[in-house]
UniProtKB/Swiss-Prot annotation:
Belongs to the G-protein coupled receptor 1 family. Residues 1-23, 78-98, 157-193, 257-267 are extracellular. CDD domains: 7tmA_OR4A-like. Disulfide bonds join 95-187. The chain crosses the membrane at residues 24-47, 56-77, 99-118, 138-156, 194-217, 234-256, 268-287. This is Olfactory receptor 4C3. It is a multi-pass membrane protein. GO terms for cellular component: plasma membrane. Its main location: membrane. Gene3D superfamilies: Rhodopsin 7-helix transmembrane proteins. Signal peptide: none annotated. Glycans are attached at residue 6. Residues 48-55, 119-137, 218-233, 288-302 are cytoplasmic.
Length: 302
């Protein structure tokens, strides 16, 4: 059966209709995007070029920074362009591509953050077996699982939307093509699809967050037997990771766990996990990490 598609493009309301505010947003988000790309790529180059940063934790951090660069690029350029121009339209094909790309990279990041928590658990709770457990082969395999999981998650999200008929209106109350705003303009009952979105996005975020929280409870419990210096170093590393986890997971859970509806605050939540968190990750991970900062100094003085 053919799916009626009278709409060839969508008009996105963005963050503001005020031209003065839009110009301010253009400057702000352009700066954020430049800082995001430069900061994350600096971490990737620093880790890949420094022999002292060859441990699993930095291997995963380099992959996270690589993902954040492209994850931010799935939303930020369009948001920046729409803040400058009045015609905030996006074709149906580009909308589907943006939806797939954002959920693909977001899914990879969710799984990778969980993998990084497992790496911290092994390093702190099983220090004598760390090198035998977290081998290069296992680390590469875990990253591969993250990419595969993100692809499957995004594929499901895309398939949920592709069969929907869009015959008008075509106004999306968002700055990016996302599931709930698209479901609102579909010309059919989308209640069941909304429940599937909650299952595929909301529950995945929630379950991964609960696993992360459980791993940190175990880590904190095991730190009682460590020395004061060991506790400080472990808490510094784990604290940075947990801040990143909270900044990414909490807005995602809020957006996708509630019953199908688009709330006004959803756009602000999307800004957190899609635009701001990729920028903050390099700062959070390197602010108190002397090894990374020393490697960066050597990189610039080489």
């Amino acid at each position: 059966m053919d799916i009626p598609q009278n709409i060839t493009e969508f008009f996105m309301l963005g963050l503001s209709q005020n031209s003065e505010v839009q110009r301010v947003l253009f400057v702000v988000f352009l700066l954020i995007y430049v800082v995001t790309v430069c900061g994350n790529m600096l971490i990737v180059v620093t880790i890949t070029s420094s022999p002292t940063l060859a441990s699993p934790v930095y291997f995963f951090l380099a992959n996270l920074s690589f993902i954040d660069t492209f994850y931010s690029s799935s939303m930020a350029p369009k948001l920046i362009a729409d803040s400058l121009y009045e015609g905030r339209t996006i074709s149906y094909e580009c909308c589907m591509a943006q939806l797939f790309g954002a959920h693909f990279l977001g899914g990879v990041e969710i799984i990778l953050l969980t993998v990084m928590a497992y790496d911290r658990y092994v390093a702190i709770c099983k220090p004598l077996h760390n090198t035998t457990i977290m081998t290069r082969h296992l680390c590469a395999m875990l990253v591969g699982v993250a990419w595969l999981g993100g692809f499957l998650h995004s594929l499901v999200q895309l398939l949920l939307v592709l069969w929907l008929p869009f015959c008008g209106p075509n106004v999306i109350n968002h700055f990016a093509c996302d599931l709930y705003p698209l479901l609102e303009v579909a010309c059919t009952n989308t209640y069941v699809i909304g429940l599937l979105v909650v299952a595929n996005s909301g529950l995945i975020c929630l379950l991964n967050f609960l696993m992360l929280a459980a791993s940190y409870i175990v880590i904190l419990y095991s730190l009682r037997s460590h020395s004061a210096d060991g506790r400080c170093k472990a808490l510094s590393t784990c604290g940075a990771h947990f801040i990143v986890v909270a900044l990414f997971f909490v807005p995602c859970i809020f957006t996708y766990v509630h019953p199908f509806s688009t709330l006004p605050i959803d756009k602000n939540m999307a800004l957190f996990y899609g635009i701001l968190t990729p920028m903050l990750n390099p700062l959070i991970y390197t602010l108190r990490n002397e090894e990374v900062k020393n490697a960066m100094r050597k990189l610039f003085t080489w």
